[in-house]
Amino acid sequence: MNVAISPGVTAGNSLPFVLFGGINVLESLDFTLDVCGEYVAVTRKLGIPFVFKASFDKANRSSIHSYRGVGLDEGLKIFAEVKARFGVPVITDVHEVEQAAPVAEIADVLQVPAFLARQTDLVVAIAKAGKPVNVKKPQFMSPTQLKHVVSKCGEVGNDRVMLCERGSSFGYDNLVVDMLGFRQMAETTGGCPVIFDVTHSLQCRDPLGDASGGRRRQVLDLARAGIAVGIAGLFLEAHPDPDRARCDGPSALPLHQLEGFLSQMKAIDDLVKRMPALEIR
């Protein structure tokens, strides 16, 4: 199963990987355009299909005092400018039923947040908006249980669903990635494209802190392993100065390393997908 996102950008587990790349949260128009411009330059140079990602509201911050974003109205204006300036599709997350319709007027892909993927009303509203859907797998859910979320989307007429791994809870305050789950997600849902969110899989929490920590020094290790499985896309956040990012900086790739990082991802993806299919039973 392949999911067409925009002209020239289609996600499928046997196709060249799509980069869902950007920033964690919108900070300003100028900052967003600067970062997106770097992504566009690198992905076009390397020939990687690209979808820009960012959140207009981080509704699940650990602290009530943490920065949440620019809000829905300003966020949609920024996304519209990104599309007009660079001609790239956009993905963003929807947290409330009422947001689905206005977000769908601008965004090319609507995302179901991991913590909300069991909320039927939200899933149905996002699916009914008629755009491709990216479902973040909750940290507490097994890969095979995502079939129920896909079924909810299908029941209201939307079969353009992608599934995104972002790590599983491993005890308290830690995440691990089960690479075996990638194929399980695809096989139990009729071949839905599988996306790997390497950035958020690197999160780790300080039990006494008020924000998530991260392990960005290991992003290359985890991304190489995920791409080597043979998946539809990579979900990545980068920042010009991760230590000063407004959210999830400890897990973000330094933006100046984007080209070197993606060059390796493309080399691995090209190699794996040139190999003949070999079913082992």
UniProtKB/Swiss-Prot annotation:
Stored SUPFAM superfamilies: Aldolase
GO cellular component: cytoplasm
Coiled-coil residue spans: none
InterPro entries: Aldolase_TIM (IPR013785), DAHP1/KDSA (IPR006218), KDO8P_synthase (IPR006269)
One Gene Ontology MF term: 3-deoxy-8-phosphooctulonate synthase activity
Family designation: Belongs to the KdsA family.
Top EC class, one word: transferase
Keyword Cytoplasm included in the entry's annotation: yes
Organism name: Burkholderia pseudomallei (strain K96243)
Name of the protein described by the UniProt record: 2-dehydro-3-deoxyphosphooctonate aldolase 2
UniProt keyword Zinc, yes or no: no
